[in-house]
A protein has these predicted regions:
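Alpha-helical, coiled-coil/dimerization segments enriched in small aliphatic residues
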Residues: 70-77, 92, 210-238
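Proline-aspartate-enriched helix->loop->beta-strand connector
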Residues: 96-110, 241-257
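Stable alpha-helical elements in mature extracytoplasmic
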Residues: 51-54, 60, 96, 119-122, ...
C-alpha cells in the first residue's frame, strides 16, 4: 500500500513507461526487439563519437557515465563537453564485458558491432541483467535496416529524446535538422542528371587494390543527397584498381580515418601508375569525408553533406 503511493508521488516514476522498438547488434542479426523504459536513464555508456555527439545534441550529456571507442578529433562545437567525459577505454578498441559491468550502466548506446560475438554479444544478455540498450539504426546489419539513410539518425534522435523524456526540449533542434535534410533533398531533385557527377567512395588503398563502400552504405545516400550519382555498387570491400579505372568517376570521396590519414591516400592516388590516370585524380576532384561523419550519423553527417553539395555545385 504505502510504498506504492509514495512511489506514485515521485513524478519521475509516475510517468507512463516509454516503450520503443530497437535493434539487436550483429550477434542477433539486427532483429527488432521491444524495450520498456520505466524511468529516465541515469548512467549511460556511450560508445563512439557519433553516439556521444547525438547525446550532447539532445542535451543529456550529464547522464553519460563513460565514453568509449572515441579516438578521432573531438567535434569542435562539443569540445568543452568532451573534456568533461570519462573515457572507459582509449583508442579504437571496444570495452570488455567486465569493464562494462563494473560501471553499472543502466543504458548502453552504441553501434551494431559492439553487440557482436567478438565484443559484448547480443543485447539480450544485457537486457536480462536489467541494462537497457540502444543500437543506432545505420550501424545494424543492412538486412535488418535496409540501405542506410541520413534521415535514420534523426529517427534515432527522436527515439532517444523519448527515452530521456526530453522530446519538448529537443523538438526545435530536431525540426531544424529535418529542414536542413529537406533542403538538400529538394536541391538534389532540382539538379538535372547531366549536371550530377558520378562518384566513387574510396576508404583504403593497398597497392593494386582499393577498399570501397557499397550501395547500401550511408555514403551512397550522402552522395545522392548532395546531388551526385553514387557508383558504389552492391559489393564493397577490396577491389582491383582496374575496376575503378573502368568506372572512371568524375569525383572521388576519400574517407579520412584516424589510423589512415587522408593526405597520405591522396598523395598515393597521384603517385599511382594506374589510378593517377583517373579523371577525378587528374582533375583533382577529390572530396574528403571524415569517417566519423559517414558512419552512424550525427550533426557532422548533415554538415558533411552540405559541404559536399556546395563542392558539387562549385565544381560541376
Amino acid at each position: 500500500g504505502c510504498s506504492y503511493q509514495s512511489r506514485q508521488a515521485d513524478t519521475s516514476l509516475a510517468e507512463a513507461p516509454v516503450v520503443i522498438k530497437n535493434f539487436d547488434g550483429y550477434a542477433g542479426n539486427g532483429r527488432l526487439m521491444q524495450q520498456s523504459f520505466n524511468k529516465v536513464p541515469q548512467r549511460v555508456l556511450a560508445v563512439s563519437e557519433s553516439v556521444v555527439d547525438d547525446l550532447i545534441f539532445l542535451g543529456v550529456q550529464d547522464r553519460i557515465v563513460a565514453i568509449s571507442a572515441c579516438y578521432s578529433k573531438n567535434y569542435a562545437p562539443y569540445e568543452e563537453e568532451y573534456a568533461k567525459l570519462t573515457r572507459l577505454t582509449e583508442g579504437t578498441g571496444y570495452p570488455s564485458k567486465e569493464a562494462v559491468l563494473g560501471m553499472q550502466p543502466d543504458l548502453i548506446v552504441s553501434w551494431g558491432s559492439l553487440f557482436g560475438d567478438s565484443a559484448l554479444g547480443s543485447v539480450e544478455y544485457w537486457q536480462q541483467k536489467g541494462i537497457h540498450t540502444y543500437v543506432m539504426t545505420n550501424t545494424v546489419p543492412v538486412k535488418a535496416s535496409g540501405r542506410r539513410r541520413v534521415e535514420y539518425f534523426v529517427n534515432d534522435l527522436q527515439q532517444l529524446a523519448k527515452i530521456f523524456r526530453v522530446e519538448e526540449k529537443a523538438k526545435d533542434k530536431i525540426v531544424g535538422l529535418k529542414k536542413r535534410i529537406q533542403v538538400l533533398q529538394l536541391q538534389s531533385k532540382a539538379t538535372p542528371k547531366a549536371n550530377k557527377p558520378k562518384v566513387v567512395t574510396l576508404q583504403y588503398l593497398y597497392g593494386n587494390e582499393y577498399f570501397c563502400r557499397t550501395a547500401s552504405d550511408l555514403t551512397a545516400d550522402m552522395i545522392a543527397l548532395a546531388g551526385g550519382i553514387s557508383l558504389d555498387d552492391k559489393l564493397g570491400g577490396r577491389k582491383s584498381v582496374e575496376y575503378l579505372v573502368k568506372l572512371d568517376p568524375d569525383m572521388l570521396i576519400v574517407i579520412d580515418t584516424e589510423t589512415t590519414p587522408v593526405a597520405d591516400k591522396i598523395k598515393a592516388l597521384h603517385a599511382h601508375k594506374v589510378l593517377s590516370r583517373l579523371k577525378a585524380v587528374r582533375n583533382n576532384k577529390i572530396f574528403v569525408v571524415q569517417h566519423r561523419a559517414f558512419y552512424c550519423g550525427s550533426l557532422r553527417t548533415v554538415e558533411a553533406v552540405e559541404a559536399m553539395q556546395k563542392y558539387i555545385e562549385d565544381n560541376f
